[in-house]
């Protein structure tokens, strides 16, 4: 399979690109230049690997979930344990890389957006480590859902700005963070949290996250002497999935499955299943599949999980859907909750609600596969942050 994206203009087929105001174009080009140089600099790579190993705690284990495997009665189920990273999710793979890049570019301050608060915490964490000032924009609704993470960010020295505009969720936080970046661009780096935004952000985030898939490949081959038959990851903006899928894209014998949030059901208005129900448009500087109405107004995304309710999806996922290399599915709030409880009770591992969507789909898939086949789930984060809201949800039900 001939797959070489993005092209030099930052396009993934028709997707991606740089739809930014003139005021940002210079910074985006400067970032691309700095990133290319850093990637070719052995000293930068060495420093990054040092922090990934000694600070983040990589490599993360590839765990054979024997009880889940027996329960499904099909393929062997493995979990790539991104929940065991420092800060409890995959997000820090990207924030540590981008923060080192910010230091290299001579920036003193970092701005970021956050939904569930995981990216905010991971950003505040690396800013504390590297002595950078940190401003985090978070939707008002998410601030309410994720009080603990807000307190964590403040403990780490970040300034958290609550965004009341729009629906008070991730999309609105991104708008405000971009606005802030435009007016502080001389001394501030924007750490985008997912494979979104104008080029080179989707590529930078993918590259820093692809440590997940590279490790998985090596670990699975060491354990089973072959590659897995299937790999499953959840998708909001799509960074954990892109990090897991990218190293497997050329291995066509490995089936790749992305799992979106179906919320209350894709037949309702309350879901975040962009690739299932969306159409092509431009949001936050990039062309991608979006949830929008006929007038092109962005629709609200809904999911029980704060990290999946983004109304768009990364440009590279948009391309991978079109060329059929990844197949995309969706899981409802209720199915994700069921999978959350099942994994917790069967394996003693409390997954994030985001990751629970991947677990739910993987269970259906594993049951249809043969016993000598293998399936890997990207367990993108731990569920501590969700326990409180799950308790509320279960009490209401």
Swiss-Prot record:
* Single GO MF descriptor: tryptophan synthase activity
Q: Which SUPFAM superfamilies match?
A: Tryptophan synthase beta subunit-like PLP-dependent enzymes
Its protein name is: Tryptophan synthase beta chain
InterPro entries in UniProt? Trp_synth_b_CS, Trp_synth_beta, Trp_synth_beta/beta-like, TrpB-like_PALP, TrpB-like_PALP_sf
Gene name of the encoded protein: trpB
Swiss-Prot/TrEMBL catalytic activity: (1S,2R)-1-C-(indol-3-yl)glycerol 3-phosphate + L-serine = D-glyceraldehyde 3-phosphate + L-tryptophan + H2O
Organism phylogeny: Bacteria, Bacillati, Bacillota, Bacilli, Bacillales
Record's function text: The beta subunit is responsible for the synthesis of L-tryptophan from indole and L-serine.
Check the record and name the PROSITE patterns matching this protein. TRP_SYNTHASE_BETA (PS00168)
């Amino acid at each position: 399979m001939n797959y070489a994206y993005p092209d030099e203009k930052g396009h993934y087929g028709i997707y991606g690109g740089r739809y930014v105001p003139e005021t940002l174009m210079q910074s985006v080009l400067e970032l691309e230049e700095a990133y290319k140089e850093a990637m070719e600099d052995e000293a930068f790579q060495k420093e990054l690997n040092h922090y990934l190993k000694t600070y983040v705690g990589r490599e993360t284990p590839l765990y054979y979930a024997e009880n889940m495997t027996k329960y499904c009665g099909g393929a062997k189920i493995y979990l790539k344990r991104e929940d065991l990273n420092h800060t409890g999710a995959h997000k820090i793979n990207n924030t540590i890389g981008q923060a080192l890049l910010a230091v290299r570019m001579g920036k003193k301050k970092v701005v970021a957006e956050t939904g569930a608060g995981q990216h905010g915490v991971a950003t505040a964490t690396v800013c504390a480590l590297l002595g950078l000032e940190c401003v985090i924009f978070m939707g008002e609704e998410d601030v309410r859902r994720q009080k603990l993470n807000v307190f964590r960010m403040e403990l780490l020295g970040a300034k958290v700005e609550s965004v009341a505009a729009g629906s008070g969720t991730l999309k609105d936080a991104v708008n405000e963070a971009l606005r802030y970046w435009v007016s502080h661009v001389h001394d501030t780096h924007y750490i985008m949290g997912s494979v979104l935004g104008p080029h080179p952000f989707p590529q930078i985030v993918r590259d820093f996250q692809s440590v997940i898939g590279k490790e998985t490949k090596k670990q699975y081959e060491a354990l089973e002497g072959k590659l897995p038959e299937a790999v499953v990851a959840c998708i909001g903006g799509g960074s954990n999935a892109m990090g897991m899928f990218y190293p497997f894209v050329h291995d066509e014998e490995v089936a790749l499955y992305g799992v979106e949030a179906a919320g209350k059901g894709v037949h309702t208005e309350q879901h975040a299943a962009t690739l299932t129900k969306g159409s092509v448009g431009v949001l936050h500087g990039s062309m991608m599949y979006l949830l929008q109405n006929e007038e092109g107004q962005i629709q609200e995304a809904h999911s029980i999980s704060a990290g999946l309710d983004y109304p768009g999806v990364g440009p590279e996922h948009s391309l991978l859907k079109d060329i059929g290399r990844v197949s995309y599915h969706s899981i409802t709030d209720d199915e994700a909750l069921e999978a959350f409880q099942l994994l917790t009770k069967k394996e003693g591992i409390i997954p994030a609600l985001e990751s629970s969507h991947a677990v739910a789909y993987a269970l259906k898939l594993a049951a249809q596969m043969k016993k000598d086949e293998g399936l890997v789930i990207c367990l993108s984060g731990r569920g501590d942050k969700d326990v409180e809201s799950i308790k509320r949800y279960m009490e209401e039900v």
